Amino acid sequence: MKTSVIFVLIVLNLMWSGEAQEVARTYCGSHLADTLADLCFGVVKRGGAQYAPYFWQKAYLGSRGKRGVVDECCFRPCTLDVLASYCG
């Protein structure tokens, strides 16, 4: 009985801690651009305008300045929260 209670508590603890952690991964190239577009502007429709307006391009700099989303999320893994912080 005591062993099964401890086992259940360990399993519940592992399940809970797994949900609390966001996975960090790398975003490079078109995957980075598409993910940023989804986070900042909603779903990107293919077949529409080929280029984003100038004011949208400036929004990619966001509040993070010139530090660089590529430096932070392509060269090193980052979370979606970090990536979303680049939205203007």
From Swiss-Prot:
Superkingdom per UniProt: Eukaryota
Disulfide bonds, paired cysteine numbers: C28-C74, C40-C87, C73-C78
Biological role stated in the UniProt entry: Brain peptide responsible for activation of prothoracic glands to produce ecdysone in insects.
Molecular function via GO: growth factor activity; hormone activity
PANTHER family for the chain: INSULIN-LIKE GROWTH FACTOR II (PTHR46886:SF1)
Protein name: Bombyxin B-8
Note: Silk worm has two kinds of PTTH: 4K-PTTH and 22K-PTTH; there are many forms of 4K-PTTH.
Chief site of localization: secreted
Localization: Secreted
Signal sequence region: 1-18
Family, similarity comment: Belongs to the insulin family.
Subunit structure, as described in the record: Heterodimer of a B chain and an A chain linked by two disulfide bonds.
Cellular compartments per GO CC: extracellular space
Cited PROSITE patterns: INSULIN (PS00262)
Organism: Bombyx mori (Silk moth)
UniProt entry keywords in alphabetical sequence: Cleavage on pair of basic residues, Disulfide bond, Hormone, Secreted, Signal
Propeptide stretches in the record: 47-65
